[in-house]
Amino acid sequence: MEQFGNFYITTPIYYVNDKPHIGHAYTSLLCDVVARFMRLAGKNVKFTTGTDEHGQKIEKAAKARGMQPKEFTDEVSVSFRELAKSMNFQYDDFIRTTEERHEKAVIALWNRLEERGQIYLDSYSGWYSVRDEAFYQESELIDGKAPTGAEVQWIKEESYFFRLSNWQNKLLELYENQPNFIFPESRKNEVVSFVRSGLTDLSISRTSFNWGIKVPGNDKHVIYVWIDALTNYLTSVGFPGTEGEEYKRFWANDSSSNVHVIGKDILRFHAVYWPAILLAADLPLPKQIAVHGWWLSEGEKISKSLGNVIDPIGLAQEFGVDQLRYFLLREASFGQDGNFSKKNMISRINSELANNIGNLVQRTISFLHKQCSGIVPTVDQSLLKGEESLPNCKAILDKAMDHLSKYEFNQIILLIINISSEANAYIDKSAPWMLSKTDRERMNLVIYKLLEYIRVIGILLQPIVPKSAEMILDQLQIPKEQRDLKSLCNACISLGITLPKPTPVFLRVETKEEK
C-alpha cells in the first residue's frame, strides 16, 4: 500500500440479506486500523463502508419476512451501523445503495459505458447463483454447484451485456505494470490465470425481478447488482461530479492512495470486472485491491447449517471491544484464513494484554507512586546511553509502517509485544526496588526509561485497541497533540508532572480451571 497525503480506504458494502458476522467485522476492522494509522501519520483520510441493498436475494429475503424490500433493508442496514458502533469503527461515510445519490452515480456510470459503445442488448442463458449474485460458466461448476458451494439455476432471459472481452489485454497490462494492484501476490496470480483463460462479455441486467435500479430508458431491466454495488466507491467521492473536491482529492489524483479491502470470495468482481468497467468508462482506477482470507471456527468453515456462526457483537460484549479487535488482528495473517477459537482468544488476552502490557503499565506506575509520590523524576539525559538508551523510536516506527504497507497487522502487534517484553525484562534486570536503597539516581533513570517504553507502546496501540491505548496515554498525562506518529519520535514524557494512580488497563479473563 502506498502512503500518499490523501488516503481513501473502503470496505465492500455488505449485503443485507442477514445479520453481520465475524467476516464483516474483520474486513471493517482492517480498514479502521489502517485509517487510524494514516490519521496518526497526518494523512487526509476517508474511510467508507455501507450496505448493498438491491438484488434478487434481498427481494426473496424480504418476501420471506412478509416485508417490502425497502422496509427490510432499512431494518437490516441498521444492524451494520450497530456493528460499526460496537466495534469502535471510525468511518467517514456510510453508503446505502438505496440512497438517491447512489442511484444517480450508477445511472451516470451506465450512461458513460453506453455512450462509449460498451453495452449492448442480447439474450443470456447460463448458470446463475442467487446467493452469490453471480453468473458461472459450465466449466466452473463443481458437482453441479458454484465454486463457493452455492446452488445454481439455469436462466434464460433478455439482458444487456458489458463488452468485458474487449478489456482482456488491457487488464493483463494493468496487472503487469502495477504489480501491487492486487495484493497479496497469490491472489494476483489467481486473477491473471483467470483473465488469461479468456473473458466473455458480462450480463449486466436482469428482468426476472424488480428490486434494483432500473436501466435508463428500459425499465423492464434492473441493473446487475454488482455494477450497482461497485459504483459505491465512486458515489462516496461525489461522482457523477468529477470536478468536486473529494473526487479530485481521493479518486482522480496521482498523489493519492485509494484501496479496496475485500474478502477473497469477491475477488473477481473487484479485480476483473471493476477495473474493466472503469477503463471502459474512461475513469481512474483504484491503486490497490487488498484481499484477506476467511475465518474458520475451530478449524471448520463457518455456516448456519453447522451452527458455528460467530457473532462479533456478542463477543465484544463478552470479552471487550479492544480485546476482540486485538485477537482478530493478532491471530490471522493477512491474505490467509484465520482460525477463531475462544480458547486461543482467552490465551492471547491473558498472556499478551494482561500479563505483558497491562502488567508493565501497572507495576511501573505503581512503583513511581511508591518511590516518587507519582512524580515523573528528573534525570540526567547524558546517562541515557549504551544499555540505558531509550527505545529507538525511529527504527520502531519505520518497522511498524513497513508492516502496515503489507497489511502485516500481526507483525505490528508482535513488534509492540516485543517492546513490552523488553521493558519487563529490563525491570527484572535493573531491579529498581533494590536501587531505591542503593542508587536513587539510577532508579530514577530506570523509571523514566520504563515510562518512555510505555509511551511508545501506548501511541502504537491506538489504531489497534483505541480505548485501552487512550487509558495508557491518559495515565502518562500525554497531551492529545503529542499522540501522533510524529510525536512518537519528537516528543517524550514530561518531567516533574504528577501521574494519576494506575488503573488496570487489561484484565485477565478467568478460565474454567481458575474458576
Report the location of each language-model feature:
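N-terminal Rossmann-like or analogous alpha/beta NTP/dinucleotide-binding catalytic cores
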Residues: E2-L121
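Short secondary-structure capping/junction motifs at helix and strand boundaries
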Residues: M87-R96, E114-W127, S139-E140, W154-I155, ...
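Cys/His-rich short segments
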Residues: R116-Q168, L172
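Structured secondary-structure scaffolds
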Residues: E2-T49, R101-A105, T148, V152-K370, ...
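Basic, alpha-helical terminal appendages of large translation-related enzymes
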Residues: M1-N6, K46-G50, R101, D122-W127, ...
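A non-catalytic, amphipathic alpha-helix used as a structural packing/dimerization or gating element
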Residues: V33, E71-E82, N356-R363, A395, ...
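Amphipathic alpha-helix face/heptad-repeat signature
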Residues: I349, L353-N356, L360, K385, ...
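Active-site-proximal binding-pocket segments
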Residues: L267, L328-E331, G335, N344, ...
